[in-house]
Amino acid sequence: MLNYQDANFITAFEGKQIEAYNISKDHGFHEEAKNFGEVIALMHSELSEALEYMRKGNGPSDHINFTGVEEEFADVIIRIMDAAHHLDLRVAEAIIAKMEFNQSRPYKNGGKKF
């Protein structure tokens, strides 16, 4: 059973998924079908841009009033939201479920260093 906060998160996230998809579609990014590999590569490219900003000191974005890493992390999430809506994936619910699952895991499970 979802609590009030989780239910609100799902509602808000799914609303933003629709908005992200519509903005992308309205700007011509859904005119041709992309394969799943392309979609993932575009998400990855945003993470690579975040890495480059951090390598250069994480200066301000050229577009919005945030750091470059903040902007690129936002771009990753926007791309995920766009894809999630297009593919009819329940990412908001999966986030909640995964966080609950992670809470139950042992400290540094699997003996991993990072």
Task: State where each predicted segment sits.
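Flexible "arm" and connector segments at domain edges
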Residues: 1-114
